[in-house]
Amino acid sequence: MMAKLMITVMMVLLLSLQQGADGRSKRWRKNQMAASSIMRNLITARGVPPRFCRDKNCNEDSECNQWCTGGCSSVKGNCES
């Protein structure tokens, strides 16, 4: 009787540990997906300057110049694609 009770307690303990590990892996997977989504958005948005940079001269504004992937046109002063 005592052995049966010990086996039952150990099985419950192992199952609860397994559920805890599954919960951590799901949370880790969600965090990884969120991080990769943010990085993907940053990478794909790199070539598109923000709205406030579209009418500015990128030679004069260093913050807008960083968004120019093709460089800044010395003649027009806008981003080259």
Swiss-Prot record:
Any one GO cellular component localisation term in the record: extracellular region
Extent of the signal sequence: 1-23
Residue positions where 4-carboxyglutamate is found in the record: 60, 63, 80
Tissue expression: Expressed by the venom duct.
Keyword Signal: yes
Compartments (UniProt record): Secreted
Any one GO MF annotation of this record: toxin activity
Coiled coil feature spans: none
Keywords in alphabetical order: Disulfide bond, Gamma-carboxyglutamic acid, Hydroxylation, Secreted, Signal, Toxin
Disulfide bond positions: 53-68, 58-72, 64-79
Principal location: secreted
Propeptide: 24-46
Keyword Disulfide bond recorded: yes
Record PTM 4-hydroxyproline, positions in chain: 49-50
InterPro entries, per database record: Toxin_Pg
Family (UniProt): Belongs to the Pg turripeptide superfamily.
The record's note on its domains: The cysteine framework is IX (C-C-C-C-C-C).
Protein name: Turripeptide Gkn9.1
Lineage, highest ranks first: Eukaryota, Metazoa, Spiralia, Lophotrochozoa, Mollusca
